[in-house]
């Protein structure tokens, strides 16, 4: 199977007061302030949950003077429409303005927005609850440096900070039909569930080491999705498929048994196709959308 990576770049325009959607400037304040104009895209795939921004999606933006926010931290910008190209506007009282003296500032951003962060810039992550997926799809944008009121356009590029699992379940068509698999649940064992991410300094999310848990993934029919934390090793992790139509029989697959699933790499998406028969489970995998996680695909058997 050839290595696959679906490279997409969906742009979302962030419109702040002082700029209209058609690109024509509205009147600026008389005190000489200039409003930030920002665009944002997401590397590889535009959204963790799917390929569109959804109405109500919000990002947080920080304007930095060195390491200080000068009161311009965690400003909220929200989109009112569901579209591949979303327009974002500042919430009331959230507009960021450049200094009137044309001094330079830096900018960072993150998604999804939260009103309150620990110490003002530390985003806490908890993946123990998987629904809705978009609420735990943490993304950060690298710092954009050296902007001022004479050059107010800031382009953010977001990257995924966690790991996506995308699982398709199907019957072998001989001993079982898809109808027999109705209600199948999927879980993954041996998971850390807590992490922190500094939205100002960026970099990787920091996993908080604690007691591991089994996470029940979000299911929709014969599809299952999960967002989990990065892991240097997948040793001890197993996917479990519990089928009510087979008297609750459970099938297990050792994630670490696949050559390219030895680790869960941040920003990677791992796709698994699970074929279930009365004799057992066959697993194949490939990668799409996010940065390649398990290459061109893998196979395995579950018992």
UniProtKB/Swiss-Prot annotation:
Subunit structure: May be part of the fimbrial tip.
Pfam families registered for this protein in UniProt: Mfa_like_1 (PF13149)
Gene3D superfamilies the record matches: 2.60.40.2630, Fimbrillin-like (2.60.40.2620)
Top-level division of the source organism's lineage: Bacteria
Subcellular localization: Fimbrium
Gene transcribed to yield this protein: fim1C
GO cellular component, one term: pilus
Functional summary from the UniProt entry: Putative component of the fimbrium tip. Fimbriae are filamentous appendages on the cell surface that mediate cell adhesion and biofilm formation.
Family membership noted in the UniProt record: Belongs to the bacteroidetes fimbrillin superfamily. Mfa-like family.
Signal peptide location: 1-22
Stated name of the protein: Putative fimbrium subunit Fim1C
Keyword annotations: Fimbrium, Signal
Keyword set includes Signal: yes
Alphabetized InterPro entries for the sequence: Mfa-like_1, Mfa-like_1_N
């Amino acid at each position: 199977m050839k290595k696959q990576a679906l490279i997409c770049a969906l742009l979302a325009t962030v419109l702040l007061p002082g700029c209209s959607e058609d690109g024509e400037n509205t009147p600026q304040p008389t005190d000489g302030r200039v409003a930030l104009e920002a665009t944002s895209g997401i590397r590889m795939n535009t959204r963790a949950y799917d390929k569109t921004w959804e109405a109500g999606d919000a990002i947080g933006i920080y304007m930095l003077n060195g390491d200080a926010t000068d009161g311009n931290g965690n400003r909220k910008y929200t989109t009112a429409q569901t579209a591949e190209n979303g327009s974002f506007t500042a919430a009331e009282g959230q507009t960021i303005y450049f200094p009137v003296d044309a001094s330079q500032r830096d900018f960072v951003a993150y998604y999804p927005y939260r009103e309150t962060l620990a110490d003002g810039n530390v985003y806490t992550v908890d993946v123990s609850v998987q629904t809705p997926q978009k609420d735990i799809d943490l993304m950060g944008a690298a710092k954009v440096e050296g902007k001022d009121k004479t050059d107010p356009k800031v382009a953010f590029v977001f990257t995924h900070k966690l790991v996506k699992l995308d699982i398709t379940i199907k019957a072998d068509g001989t001993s079982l039909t898809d109808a027999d698999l109705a209600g199948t649940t999927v879980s993954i064992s041996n998971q850390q569930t807590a992490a922190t991410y500094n939205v100002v300094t960026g970099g990787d999310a920091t996993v908080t080491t604690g007691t591991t848990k089994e996470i029940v993934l979000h299911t929709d029919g014969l599809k299952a999705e999960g967002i989990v934390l990065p892991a240097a090793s997948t040793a001890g992790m197993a996917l479990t498929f519990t089928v009510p139509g087979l008297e609750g029989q459970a099938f297990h697959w050792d994630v670490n048994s696949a050559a390219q699933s030895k680790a869960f790499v941040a920003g990677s998406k791992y796709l698994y196709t699970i074929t279930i028969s009365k004799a057992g489970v066959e697993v194949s995998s490939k990668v799409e959308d996010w940065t390649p996680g398990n290459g061109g695909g893998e196979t395995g058997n579950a018992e």
